[in-house]
Amino acid sequence: MESLVLGGDLGGTSTRILVVGTDGREHGLSTGDGGNPISRPAGAAAALGDALQRALAGVDPGQVQASVIGVAGWSALRTPVVAAQFAEVWADAGLTCDPGYRSDLEVAFAAGTPEPDGTVLVAGTGATAGAVTGHRLTRTADGHGWLLGDDGSGFWLGREAVRAALRSLDAGEPHGRLAGSVLAALDAAGTADRGRDRVIQVVYSHPPVQLAALAPLVSAAYHDGDPQARSIVERAAAALLATVGRVREEGQGTPIVLAGSLTRDTPVGATLRTLLSARFSGPILPARTGVGGAAWLALAALDPALATPATHSRLCR
């Protein structure tokens, strides 16, 4: 009976499960709803359980000999009540091996490189960086959430865009590209007083993290040459650079893996890569599919000899 391994990536927006053989060949794959065990433990456990059931539909769960699952907010799994919820869905899926829950930073790093040591930055709705040694997270910076940190994140960009629009209203200035697009998105066109009141009303009527939805407006205005957008992009990239600098020493030649929507083909991502190249040595690599990185780490957990560069290339396309 062939041994299989399972990789998982449980994030706030989606959950992915991948089951592969020892050669990296796919035996099962599923994608479903996301969930964070810190904010929605029951929902996160249910999302994981559903994804597990579908990924394992065509295989014997008893064949799965090792697993690694990256979890955003994985520290919540140390809480007995949350751990019990996750243990229940794991057992219901017929799995008997250890789930191998890990920080999503470790999985993101493995999704970008087979190297054991280096630095990873995840910048999407939130932002956090980590130092990785021997494929395990040893230090972190930021990731403190929208109220206390996540500097340079999608939330941060959205908040700065709204603040720029409010300053424009306060000053009675003609609206630039960024301010105009923010006011339109918030249905806050009109007089300065009406605009300010409407912006405040709309923003405070939604969860704060939803400000991240305005981040693309910053990118669009940047491409149109808006000076406010340019300033926000430059400050965001500088903040992310500083976050990396808190976990990485200058002179290290190990890889820097970038994950998350902001690090891709965006003005912040491009500016950040320029800043990183100027300050640090070592290759700057994009994270590929997170679930592939998790499956590759699961192969290493089963037998380090299986976690080859070839299987990494197959899984992390």
Which residues does each predicted region cover?
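Conserved phosphate-binding catalytic cores of ATP/NTP-utilizing and phosphoryl-transfer enzymes
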Residues: 1, 92, 96-120, 137
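ATP-binding/phosphotransfer module of carbohydrate and carboxylate kinases, centering on a glycine-rich
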Residues: 1-63, 111-119, 162-317
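Short beta-strand-loop/turn "lid" adjacent to the catalytic site in phosphate-handling enzymes
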Residues: 36, 55-93, 100-101, 110-114
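Glycine-rich phosphate-binding loop of actin/hexokinase-like ATP-binding domains
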Residues: 116-168
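Short glycine-aspartate micro-motif
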Residues: 5-9, 66-68, 100, 118-122, ...
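Glycine/charged-rich beta-loop-alpha catalytic/anionic-binding loops adjacent to active sites
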Residues: 88-95, 137-145, 274-282
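A short glycine/serine-rich beta->alpha loop
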Residues: 37-38, 73-74, 143-151, 280-285
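N-terminal loops that bind phosphate or other acidic moieties
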Residues: 72-75, 123, 224, 268
